[in-house]
């Protein structure tokens, strides 16, 4: 009996992974608004009914499919928060590498989750929490910079929020479907923008 239960559990996990894999592949070329349960299940060769044994709806599917990516984003946030970005371009560049790597690996899925957030309150709340954490970390990082302290912007909190939203929009545009440019170019571009704000007049190239 125990063996039978284990086989059933393994079979359910296999089916769930098959559905997640199909959806992950489809969002490379399909927006969330265009994605349908029928299309996902057609990719798996399984019936529509089976989908609802595992997921409530497409938003639920994306949340589960994106769990790894979201966990990696939180880890990237931690790395950004610990980076000594007041030290200059190399430190800023290193701070961005983890987040750029996450978007490089999971860009289409993160784009689909962002699109789904426009229509799903739970997903929207989750995205807002991630954005706020990044904005808070950005503000704390900027506040500790001597050049910012000497010549502060009119509203440091809003500057941090604007930089964070720019980061997110740029990364989603660059990696939301097939990668448009190399990750190294993205890292350097973000480094140059942040250097212009945090260390005006200083070079953003590697030291």
Locate each region found by the language model.
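Helical hydrophobic small-molecule/effector-binding pocket
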Residues: 89-114, 129, 133-140, 164-165
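Hydrophobic alpha-helical connector segments
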Residues: 60, 64, 78-105, 151, ...
């Amino acid at each position: 009996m125990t063996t039978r239960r284990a086989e059933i559990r393994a079979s359910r996990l296999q089916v769930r992974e098959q559905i997640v894999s199909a959806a992950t592949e489809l969002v490379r070329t399909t927006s969330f608004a265009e994605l349908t349960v029928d299309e996902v299940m057609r990719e798996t060769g399984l019936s529509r009914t089976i989908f609802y044994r595992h997921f409530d709806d497409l938003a639920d599917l994306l949340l589960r499919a994106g769990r790894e990516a979201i966990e990696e984003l939180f880890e990237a946030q931690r790395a950004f928060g610990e980076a000594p970005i007041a030290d200059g371009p190399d430190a800023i560049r290193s701070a961005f590498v983890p987040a750029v790597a996450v978007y490089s690996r999971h860009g289409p899925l993160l784009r689909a989750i962002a699109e789904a957030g426009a229509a799903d309150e739970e997903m929207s709340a989750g995205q807002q929490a991630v954005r706020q954490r990044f904005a808070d970390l950005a503000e704390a990082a900027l506040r500790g910079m001597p050049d910012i302290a000497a010549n502060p912007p009119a509203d440091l909190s809003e500057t941090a929020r604007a930089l964070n939203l720019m980061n997110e929009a740029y990364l989603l545009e660059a990696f939301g479907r097939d990668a448009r440019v190399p990750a190294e170019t993205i890292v350097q571009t973000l480094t140059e923008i942040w250097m212009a704000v945090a260390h005006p007049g200083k070079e953003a190239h590697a030291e």
